[in-house]
Amino acid sequence: MLPFKLWVDADALPKILREVILRASDRYQLEVIFVANQNVGITPSVRIKSLQVLSGADQADQEIVNRMSENDIVITQDIPLAAQVIEKGGIAIHPRGEVYTTANVKARLHLRDFMDTLRGAGVQTGGPPPISERDKREFSSALDQTILKQKRKTA
């Protein structure tokens, strides 16, 4: 197995992306841990694990941050979690394929705070559209590129 792990913030992960993650685990012999506050319906194996945490805001996020190591990869759409992952030396990937960086995560945090302010004022902001086949391909490509980059870095 590789010297780094793939952590999945599974509470909000679109189900369409699970197969991409499981295929990557097989292809690269990569350990994957799905973390959620509910059963995610993943069959455990040698490389695939599921970790159920207590219900509550940010419980899964905190568990990931506490358990992850430098160079680990985390899949999340949670901006504060992505910021913590980067701060701890990991790599965070959005389910639509964007790899978070120190610069873009700060911009995303500001935008998130602004949208929270709008929602607090009663403005309906709507949510993101469902994951498309194009998003799935972009996520798969970003995940493969990130795994290969980490393989070279940790070799």
UniProtKB/Swiss-Prot annotation:
Q: What InterPro entries does the record point to?
A: UPF0178 (IPR003791)
Source domain of life: Bacteria
Q: Name one Pfam family in it.
A: DUF188
Coiled coil regions, renumbered to chain: none
In this chain, the stretch annotated as Disordered covers: 120-155
Which family, according to the similarity comment? Belongs to the UPF0178 family.
Against HAMAP family, the record matches this protein to: UPF0178
**What is the name listed in the Swiss-Prot or TrEMBL entry for this protein?**
UPF0178 protein A1S_2615
Q: Which organism is it from?
A: Acinetobacter baumannii (strain ATCC 17978 / DSM 105126 / CIP 53.77 / LMG 1025 / NCDC KC755 / 5377)
